[in-house]
Regions:
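SAM-dependent Rossmann-like transferase core, predominantly class I methyltransferases
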Residues: 77-145
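General small-molecule cofactor/ligand-binding pocket signal
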Residues: 36, 72, 98, 174, ...
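Conserved SAM/SAH cofactor-binding pocket of Class I
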Residues: 120, 124-205, 209
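Short structural boundary motif marking the start of a folded domain
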Residues: 2-4, 112, 277
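S-adenosylmethionine
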Residues: 178-283
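N-terminal auxiliary segments of SAM/dcSAM-dependent transferases
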Residues: 2-107
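A short helix-to-beta-strand connector/capping loop
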Residues: 64-68, 93, 110, 171, ...
Length: 283
């Protein structure tokens, strides 16, 4: 998985700071993981993905009052330094997430807050997809059908969802991701939050997962959720809850069909934010 920096030039070079902020917010809503304005009015945004993801992101920018100036692949280890919004605390339900630069970061944080180092497994809760899962997870924890759920985090990224679940329920959590770099980032965050005894993170392929889980968390692209629907159903216990996100409104119907119409899941609730959908399914 690659990181790309995309530089845009607004059509109106005299935009106010509020107008520039509006364009930056729109880019985040459309999937950018960070934005910066180093040489106003030029805006640089950052995305993660392969070349198809890059093409898809660029294709949806046609209605913005900007022209494309440059697209560059950037180092995954350096880009976060260019994005000040990465470091803002996030409140999601009863959870607070505080991004930090490293385990040596000694800034005070609210009691009980999750500390997350941004990295290849980007996931600090800033993006709507992650934030909605955290909110749903917080709500689930307030009135769980099982106070000690067996938890599986599919596509763990930075480990934020697995860490949150471990903190909320004090139960073991199995987390996987296909990216070795993401798992390294997740393990750093797991240690940072002192839940190494609860969370295991690995690159184990989904088809090799043998356990059964009553709570499944999956913040993935909607198309991937469709592809993995059989495996998600296979590892779910009867009555299991799945909180899924990363779904664009364009593919939501496909995800609903794959889980509810074809595999017997029941839609409990769906939420939308900035063009993204998060859903809670029960088996």
């Amino acid at each position: 998985m690659k990181w790309y920096a995309i530089t845009l030039s607004p059509s109106n070079p005299t935009l106010s700071s509020d107008e520039l902020d509006g364009i930056c917010a729109e880019l985040m809503d459309r999937g950018a993981l960070g934005t910066t304005v180093e040489r106003a009015p030029e805006i640089t945004c950052y995305i993660q993905g392969d070349e198809d993801a890059l093409k898809g992101f660029l294709a949806q920018l046609g209605d913005l009052p900007c022209s494309l100036q440059a697209t560059n692949e950037v180092s995954e280890s350096n880009w976060t330094g260019s994005c000040p919004e990465v470091w803002e605390p996030i409140h999601a339900g009863n959870l607070v997430v505080v991004p930090v630069e490293s385990s040596e970061d000694t800034r005070p944080v609210p009691e009980g807050a999750l500390r997350i180092i941004p990295g290849l497994g980007f996931g600090t809760g800033h993006h709507a997809t992650t934030r909605m899962v955290l909110c749903e997870l917080s709500a689930f924890a307030a009135n769980p059908p099982d106070k000690h759920p067996s938890v599986f985090d599919l596509g763990t990224g930075s480990g934020i969802l697995a860490i949150a679940a471990a903190r909320l329920f004090q139960v073991p959590v199995e987390a996987i991701d296909i990216e070795e770099g993401a798992i390294m980032n997740a393990k750093d965050n797991i240690a940072l939050n002192h839940v190494e005894h609860l969370v295991s993170a690995s690159t184990t392929p989904m088809q090799d997962i043998k356990g059964s889980f009553s709570l499944i968390l999956a913040n993935l692209y909607g198309e991937v959720l469709v592809q993995l629907a059989d495996h998600v159903t296979r590892v779910a216990t009867p009555g299991a809850t799945a909180i899924v996100s990363g779904i664009t409104e364009l593919v939501w119907d496909q995800v609903h069909e794959a889980y509810c119409e074809k595999r017997g899941w029941r839609l409990v609730r769906e939420n939308a934010d900035s063009g993204w959908v998060c859903a809670v399914f029960e088996r």
